[in-house]
């Protein structure tokens, strides 16, 4: 029964993130159509992660108290509403409203990871979390391409309503899948136990659980550099090599493919041989090597190699570290733990885009990637500290 639950969860995660990914590349063009300055555009992206950062621990606690299914359904409903607001936006304030609502309602990822943890034995948890990570990667991989096709190539006549409606319909479809195919994974007994226990906030949880604190810090460092890469790569590629959107899109598609392959299959093969701690460490080293390679790349081939290393590194680190984090939870507070852990990544996605531009302008085109490599390396120490203090 437990293995049967992972298939529908995978499908729900793909469809959910696909709807989100469809609209990601369209927001800059929508903001430009409304005359938004670059700083305002950055803020539109950052406000989503900021709201997600605030809300994720709350969603995690609610999923422990009321179950995973209600949180998934509520989050998908909020996402559907935010897509409609975005598609029919009449100004920049509408864009902000959409992203704020979407960020506050983004409890889906933490709930999906908690669900996968619920239905997986400890020895298979990394593989199950990797499967959810792969589903998220597929959504991010296919979404932007589909969004571009739906909107059209001519920016003067591009339709933003069509992609938004498709995204909203995907959310409704995902709600139906959760309702009819996903049984509740958080048992009534666990929920009753959670209701009678003292509530622990995210900061207190990090203080009381050193291993979780170290893992969350490692995730923050890695995700920060990932956000730097994603936010500045197109500008770097244009100015250094003259790469257009098609080439950049192909390169980022390849990065996402490798990350998905690692999370969906590579982790399943490597964790039994290496363990989560060693695989997470190798993931950090590979990601750092990829960032350095991109920074010094003299041509398209080396750039592709660097991005390939980044994809493999991130795809190795994320499910391994998530599995280690889930092991710091008791059965009654797994959602809270995963929500707290995911908040560190949300914080990194707030900070990364805001600093990549100034670093690029002040220190040169390759500097953001080199700074990212230096920031990421200490994650190895935090991983090993987490292993030493793990439950």
Positions of predicted regions on the chain:
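Conserved MFS/SLC helix-loop-helix module at the cytosolic interface between two early adjacent transmembrane helices
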Residues: 53-92
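Helix-to-loop junctions at the C-terminal end of transmembrane segments
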Residues: 56-67, 262-276, 360
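Short amphipathic helix-loop junctions that connect adjacent transmembrane helices
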Residues: 25-39, 231-247
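C-terminal transmembrane helical hairpin of 12-TM major facilitator-type secondary transporters
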Residues: 262, 277-321
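C-terminal membrane-cytosol helix-exit motif in multi-pass small-molecule transporters
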Residues: 170-188, 382-386
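Juxtamembrane intracellular "pre-TM" segments in multi-pass secondary transporters
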Residues: 1-3, 183-217
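Helix-loop-helix hairpin linking two adjacent transmembrane segments in secondary transporters
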Residues: 132-180
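Cytoplasmic helix-loop-helix junction between adjacent transmembrane helices
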Residues: 98-137
